[in-house]
């Protein structure tokens, strides 16, 4: 039976589409006439190729296209008329049995969107983390900024930044420059030698044996020590062997951190050099980071709560579509990282199956909860979020123009606001426990979740 949508399962449907052959033939001839005006064929001027030759060359292909185009249009009309919400793309198969002589027919199989049932959210439990930015956190951030602007001066020098010392030994925090050479059984080996090699003592960037050898040395002094390479060392020629290294200290420099004054404040973009304003800006940035992290942590809990509270079947077609999107995202990421031939790299979609199913499921749940509770993002909400984001930039108005000048960026902010609305709605229903942590604890917890 044509035009009747059959139920094949929870989400699977089928409809038979019958199309009169006369309609197919009429549109086929119209397309061939249009094609004949542009088609090129040896021995004929453009637009002068006889219709019989055009039909012989292209008739079968054009008829195939017309049949499927008409089937697609009819499918769209039927599902729209019957208010059927199609998930993904239908699959068309030519139907041969039980078809009248004057018609062509297709079986279209497809999936529909599921009914989403969201359970009692009052049983959900979420933890809302809060953090207060103290003066100590501001001080720690200033120390980090100072260390990022560190410069070094040779020990034993006089002058404004000289330490006045003469015969000094290397200590933690100093930047040392040394030569080293390693030997195995008295012979040098590849990669075991360097000259004028700098590193900062105590940062842990060098092997512990090198750090210990350099500590306490004075310029011009040398020290020899053994270094055992592990069995699984990447250099096969030295793996499992013990080398004898000799280091010779050539320079010791001490770390000079900039003072916290107007010059330092200006280097951070404070035009008038106000240290007080600099501290206020740092506090504001830290509070913005706290808001971002705590919101992300709360959002993740809310999404998990919604997944647990909801019942729905997920259309396979939507999962497959999202798998392909994730494959393309992974490929673009590899390209941006400089991976050669990333465009042609085979990435199996199956590896994203679970992630895609979760994303699709959440998308369906969010769409339902937003629609049922009027949680759509309002224009004033979007504007307020953009204004808050723009505050951290030198020219907030330019940032506002940047957002409103691109529909994609605006859509991303709209999605963010919509998520906020859902989070606030769920928190209004669920059992929420407030938890206070330090900024350091918050950072550590956030990093663990990302790992």
Curated annotation (Swiss-Prot):
- PANTHER family found in the cross-reference section: TRIGGER FACTOR CHAPERONE AND PEPTIDYL-PROLYL CIS/TRANS ISOMERASE (PTHR30560), TRIGGER FACTOR-LIKE PROTEIN TIG, CHLOROPLASTIC (PTHR30560:SF3)
Q: What Gene3D superfamilies does this protein's entry cite?
A: 3.10.50.40, Trigger factor ribosome-binding domain (3.30.70.1050), Trigger factor, C-terminal domain (1.10.3120.10)
Q: Which Pfam families match?
A: FKBP_C, Trigger_C, Trigger_N
Q: What does this protein do?
A: Involved in protein export. Acts as a chaperone by maintaining the newly synthesized protein in an open conformation. Functions as a peptidyl-prolyl cis-trans isomerase.
Name the Gene Ontology biological process terms.
'de novo' cotranslational protein folding; cell division; chaperone-mediated protein folding; protein transport; protein unfolding
Q: Which InterPro entries match?
A: PPIase_dom_sf, PPIase_FKBP_dom, Trig_fac, Trigger_fac_C, Trigger_fac_C_sf, Trigger_fac_ribosome-bd_bac, Trigger_fac_ribosome-bd_sf, Trigger_fact/SurA_dom_sf
Catalysed reaction equations from the record: [protein]-peptidylproline (omega=180) = [protein]-peptidylproline (omega=0)
According to its record, what is known about the domains? Consists of 3 domains; the N-terminus binds the ribosome, the middle domain has PPIase activity, while the C-terminus has intrinsic chaperone activity on its own.
Give the lineage: Bacteria, Pseudomonadati, Pseudomonadota, Betaproteobacteria, Burkholderiales
EC number in record: 5.2.1.8
Name the gene that codes for it: tig
Its annotated compartments are: Cytoplasm
Presence of keyword Cell cycle:
yes
Query: Which family, according to UniProt?
Result: Belongs to the FKBP-type PPIase family. Tig subfamily.
From the UniProt record, which GO molecular function terms apply?
A: peptidyl-prolyl cis-trans isomerase activity; protein folding chaperone; ribosome binding
Q: Which GO terms describe its cellular component?
A: cytoplasm
> Which keywords annotate this record?
Cell cycle, Cell division, Chaperone, Cytoplasm, Isomerase, Rotamase
Q: Write down what this protein is called.
A: Trigger factor
What range(s) does the PPIase FKBP-type domain occupy?
A: 173-258
